[in-house]
């Protein structure tokens, strides 16, 4: 699967705003063409799980309507998203993996799943903690969340790679402790280097660390439905067609999918 980020088909102006949800007609026409040719999944950034004590039900219902309209096979969203003073500013911060957050997320995820009417996959974000203990804490947290709610996981391998490079977190230990049967989608992407670390922008070639993680984990994910190549819309003109195809074929060979004809 290819994912172009950001891909916005509607805008949420926030709670209490008149005509809160604004649709983009030109983008709707494009997604309708795609829906006639491909199986689709919805990837959201607006539910802001964990950002407050209450789920934004209106936003979840709007997302559900879109998923139903285009027959999306599942809906994915990011975890965690700490929001202070803004409804959907999911990059405002990162939450701690503790019982309070687990309780909040369990309630929100269960409500969201009832509204969405489609399987819900939750994506790992770059962690805010440091050190070896984080891997064990986070894997136990995610296992508890999936077992309690029945939701599944979208494992972003570049975010996991960022944890290793920027935070000193043992990605291998996280994988070894995690229930891999909960993983139904994997994201692979790239990022920018900066002094002392990397940032998650998906702009350049995939780092070898991402490929190593994919090779290590994909064959062990018995319920994996797809691997998604994530790239930003800002790079549309800069993408090298042959290089993209080469990366896709490398991913196919690791996952065990037959090589496509071009």
Q: Where would I find each of the regions flagged by the language model?
A:
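Short, small-residue-biased leader/transition segments that mark boundaries at the very start
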Residues: 1-2
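Active-site beta-loop-alpha junctions enriched in small/polar residues
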Residues: 5-8, 45-48, 79-80, 125-127, ...
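Acidic-and-aromatic substrate-binding clefts and catalytic sites of carbohydrate-active enzymes
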Residues: 6-26, 48-58, 128-136, 161-168, ...
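Gly/Pro-rich active-site loop or hairpin
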Residues: 12-25, 93-102, 163-223, 238
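Acidic (Asp/Glu)-rich catalytic clusters
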Residues: 22-42, 58-73, 110-115, 144-148, ...
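Structural preference for beta-strand elements that scaffold enzyme active sites
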Residues: 37-41, 72-76, 119-123, 152-154, ...
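Active-site acidic/histidine proton-transfer and metal-coordination neighborhood
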Residues: 55-153
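C-terminal helical cap(s) of enzyme catalytic domains, especially alpha/beta-barrels
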Residues: 238-261
């Amino acid at each position: 699967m290819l994912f172009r980020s950001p891909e916005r088909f509607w805008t949420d102006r926030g709670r209490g705003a008149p005509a809160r949800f604004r649709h983009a007609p030109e983008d709707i026409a494009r997604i309708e063409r795609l829906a006639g040719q491909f199986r689709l999944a919805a990837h959201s950034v607006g539910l802001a799980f964990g950002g407050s004590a209450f789920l934004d039900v209106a936003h979840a219902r709007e997302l559900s309507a879109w998923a139903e309209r285009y027959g999306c096979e599942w809906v994915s969203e990011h975890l965690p998203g700490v929001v202070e003073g803004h409804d959907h500013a999911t990059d405002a911060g990162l939450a701690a993996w503790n019982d309070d957050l687990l309780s909040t997320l369990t309630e929100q995820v269960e409500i969201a799943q009832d509204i969405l009417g489609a399987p819900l996959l939750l994506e790992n974000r770059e962690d805010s903690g440091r050190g070896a203990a984080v891997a064990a804490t986070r894997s136990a947290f995610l296992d508890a969340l999936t077992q309690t709610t029945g939701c599944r996981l979208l494992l972003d391998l570049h975010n996991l790679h960022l944890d290793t490079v920027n935070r000193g977190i043992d990605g291998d230990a996280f994988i070894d402790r995690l229930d891999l049967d909960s993983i139904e989608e994997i994201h692979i992407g790239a990022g920018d280097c900066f002094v002392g670390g990397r940032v998650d922008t998906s702009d350049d070639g995939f780092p070898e660390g991402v490929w190593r993680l994919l090779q290590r984990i994909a064959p062990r994910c018995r319920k994996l439905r797809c691997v998604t190549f994530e790239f930003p819309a800002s790079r549309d003109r800069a993408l090298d067609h042959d290089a993209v195809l080469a990366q896709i074929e490398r991913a196919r060979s690791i996952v065990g999918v037959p090589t496509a004809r071009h």
